Amino acid sequence: MTVKTRFAPSPTGYLHVGGARTALYSWLFAKNKGGEFVLRIEDTDLERNSQEAVDAILEGMKWMGMEWDEGPYYQSKRFDRYNEVVDLLLSEDKAYKCYASKELLDEIRTEQEENKEMARYDANHPKIVAANAAAKEGDASVIRFRNPKEGSVVFDDQIRGRIEISNSQLDDLIIRRTDGAPTYNFVVVVDDWDMGITQVIRGEDHINNTPRQINIYEALGAPVPMFAHCAMILGDDGAKLSKRHGAVSVMQYRDEGYLPNALNNYLVRLGWSHGDQEIFSQEEMINLFSLDAVSKSASAFNTDKLRWLNNHYIKTSEPEYVANYLQWHLDQKEISLDNGPAITDVITLVSERCNTLIELADQSRYFYEDFEAFDAGAAKKHLRGVAKGPLELALAKIEALQEWTTENLHNVIEEVCAELEIGMGKIGMPLRVAVTGGGQSPSVDAVMQLIGKERVVTRIKMALAFIAEREANA
């Protein structure tokens, strides 16, 4: 039997990190078993759905690298199938029409609460029986599933173990509303049955839905999939994760400069572990993932940990991989790569210092664009009269270079230090400010090599002019 998992988001908002982790676990489980991963859009709530949300979900899935084997399927296009199954249940007396109005049900619920009874639907309540008896053909009705009254629903949750719910706690679920719209718990069963889903991995907020759905599977004679319910994700303060804890949308993390491999690595560890290992390639995640190692306890989202992982992936990933995702940020900042070194060379040089792709884009700018002014603090400290001699000597030697290599540029700096009998900082820092515009960069000889001779010469002359003007105004 082919293992089949699914991710079934509702398009009423963005793809949030909780949903993304559920999708990732489902995707990894399928890949680990050599199975298939299905994407289904649960868009039966026609009033709240939006195409914008659908597009955001698909974009988020693709950005994270979770390509689906089937789909996306849309529930809104399957209403005929749902009605067909409703009719089947009606014909077998496993479902029935209920004519009790919302007002009547509210009245009964109020009475139950006043009598300190469990508020629930009871098909045998005298008022409901009377309402059904008085109904005429054509009156508005819902369709309810006839839930078993005896026994229990027992299932082995692959994360939480054995779960048992008494049928006496479950009422007769509405499976089709008065407007003809099918309900969530019903269409999920029909979809999973039709699509051959063998494994349902979802959030723990669905545990109460599972026994209801199992009873529908059994009424239809459909195979019941295995279930696994993941614990929720909390903020670092122990409260349920929300916008106040930072970004919650997958694409917001893209916008803030995170790599998908870093986010995937972080999300997989929010509840799953393999010994003490922290860093997992996609291949390792697929090979090692197991629901047996998923925790029953909630996990706390820690942005500092995510930033650490992102820095690791920026530093250690192939430059071509980083460049692919960096390009979006370069475009946002209107940094053109037309006039400068290969971006992969820049990434190799500057990535060590960058926690996000936004920082990487900012630190790439001076390789491609000239600046009109120096950073005020760096210039005040390093572009002073004492730097004039070292910069002039360095400029002369740089202009005379026949071969533009990092080694030759390093030799220039050493020669200036030797001839003027000064420490490395007396020329290194003024040079850094001169060629980058600021006070922080990787090794200045390597930076100059990538920037190119013409730009380096122009920028050193600009720094000398700045020093001259500063002295004139002193």
Curated annotation (Swiss-Prot):
Keywords: Aminoacyl-tRNA synthetase, ATP-binding, Cytoplasm, Ligase, Nucleotide-binding, Protein biosynthesis
GO molecular function: ATP binding; glutamate-tRNA ligase activity; tRNA binding; zinc ion binding
One of the protein's GO biological processes: glutamyl-tRNA aminoacylation
Parts forming coiled coils: none
One Pfam family cited in the UniProt record for this chain: Anticodon_2
Gene3D superfamilies named in the record: 1.10.10.350, HUPs (3.40.50.620)
Motif position, 'HIGH' region: 9-19
Catalytic activity: tRNA(Glu) + L-glutamate + ATP = L-glutamyl-tRNA(Glu) + AMP + diphosphate
Keyword set includes Lipoprotein: no
A GO CC term assigned to this protein in UniProt: cytosol
'KMSKS' region (motif): residue ranges: 240-244
Subcellular location: Cytoplasm
Annotated positions binding ATP: K243
Enzyme class: ligase
Domain of life: Bacteria
Family: Belongs to the class-I aminoacyl-tRNA synthetase family. Glutamate--tRNA ligase type 1 subfamily.
Assembly notes: Monomer.
Protein purpose: Catalyzes the attachment of glutamate to tRNA(Glu) in a two-step reaction: glutamate is first activated by ATP to form Glu-AMP and then transferred to the acceptor end of tRNA(Glu).
HAMAP family attached to this UniProt entry: Glu_tRNA_synth_type1
This protein's name: Glutamate--tRNA ligase
Encoding gene, per UniProt annotation: gltX
